[in-house]
Swiss-Prot record:
Any single Gene Ontology cellular-component annotation: extracellular region
GO biological process: establishment of competence for transformation
First-listed, main subcellular location of the protein, grouped into a coarse class: secreted
Organism: Streptococcus mitis
Gene: comC
Gene Ontology molecular function terms on file: pheromone activity
Family: Belongs to the ComC family.
Top-level taxon in the UniProt lineage: Bacteria
Pfam families: ComC (PF03047)
Residue stretch(es) of the prosequence: 1-24
Keywords: Competence, Pheromone, Secreted
Function, in words: Acts as a pheromone, induces cells to develop competence for genetic transformation.
The protein's name: Competence-stimulating peptide
Length: 41
């Protein structure tokens, strides 16, 4: 369960960072999903 908590904290941190960046709002959701669910090659 420790990993889950760390992931949630990491996501919350990224959300704060993304909120600061108001330039490319349309791209942010895609970037955020790449962070949370990395694409398998």
């Amino acid at each position: 369960m420790k990993n889950t908590v760390k992931l949630e904290q990491f996501v919350a941190l990224k959300e704060k960072d993304l909120q600061k960046i108001k330039g490319g709002e349309s791209r942010l959701p895609k970037i955020r999903f790449d962070f949370i669910f990395p694409r398998k090659k």
